[in-house]
A protein has these predicted regions:
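Hydrophobic N-terminal alpha-helices or hydrophobic patches in metabolic proteins across all domains
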Residues: 2-134
Length: 134
């Protein structure tokens, strides 16, 4: 199953119901911020252009569940991980993007300080799934 509990609205992937729990290529994700929603932070606010959440029951380098942005390609064969340059232990995972460039553009659209963009790693979806719960 590629998408479960999701639909395409105005060319964007969105959660179907208020639970905001989805499956993306059988990866369980909780959507914290959906398309069009705004998050406030100390430097202003960010409008989200794609769904953003976390991969359930995982632990990232920050010891919290793995943060992820969900692009519009349910068949994407690669995953992109961007390390935040201003944070030693924070990275964002990009699922559903066709290219590294698309993932980077999505990152830049959601961060007002472009200096946060750090190293980007590309993994095959198959390899990513094999190490996800290690």
């Amino acid at each position: 199953m590629l998408f479960s509990n999701m639909k395409i609205r105005n060319g964007r992937v969105v959660a179907l119901d208020e639970s905001k729990d989805i499956l993306y290529q059988n990866i369980p994700i909780h959507i914290e911020t959906d398309v069009g929603e705004i998050r406030e932070h100390k430097n202003g606010q960010t409008t989200f252009y794609v769904p953003y959440g976390y991969i359930k029951n995982t632990k990232g380098i920050d010891n919290e569940e793995i943060d992820c942005f969900i692009g519009n390609n349910p068949y994407a064969s690669n995953v992109y991980i961007i390390k935040l340059a201003k944070a030693d232990k924070e990275e964002k995972t990009f699922l559903g993007f066709n290219t590294k460039e698309e993932a980077v553009l999505c990152f830049l659209a959601h961060y007002s300080n472009q200096d946060f963009l750090g190293e980007t790693t590309e993994l095959s979806m198959q390899f990513f799934k094999s190490i996800l719960y290690d």
